[in-house]
Amino acid sequence: MENYSDQIAGVDEVGRGALFGPVVAAAVILADATIQQLLDQGMTDSKQLSPRQRLSLNQHIREQAVAYQIGMASVYEIDRLNILQASLLAMRRSVLRLSITPQRCLVDGNQKIPQLPMPQTTLIKGDQSEPAIAAASILAKVWRDQLIIRLDQRYPCYHLASNKGYGSAKHRQALQDLGPTRQHRLSFTPCQVSPLFR
């Protein structure tokens, strides 16, 4: 585990594999004094937590973080750039929007974020080993899930509240029956069906 005496930001993204909606990233700076408290409250990789646990930890992280910020890349940007570059763009935005400039970033995965002014360390499965990355994964996941649930009210036939934009059987069937919406990623093969833009 990294020593957090410096101001180090953990950075992670969610939604890369979804068929619908933006890719969302978060950057989080945690103080040494709060890390153990958050770990004691169950903080870990967001994928290992229930929705209720994520919501509770999301609140604790927001209250206790030195700084945090969300970044997003739109469906248009995903289709124009590709999902990898859009994910890196969302992560870059989250870091650059922080109220405190971190001295270093710990980035989940194996890709460094382009055009950041500070050093970076990439960590595969970093959300399982680094508290600041785990915190970022939780903030990004909760923010994106809440957005998708709101969009489910506009597009109820795609079952977004349950699948969060990922390619469940019901979601794929709705794409076949109804075609994609403006929030579907047309560069993703399952979304390349007609009629377009309901």
What are these regions (language model features)?
Residues M1-R198:
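RNase H-like, Mg2+-dependent phosphodiesterase core
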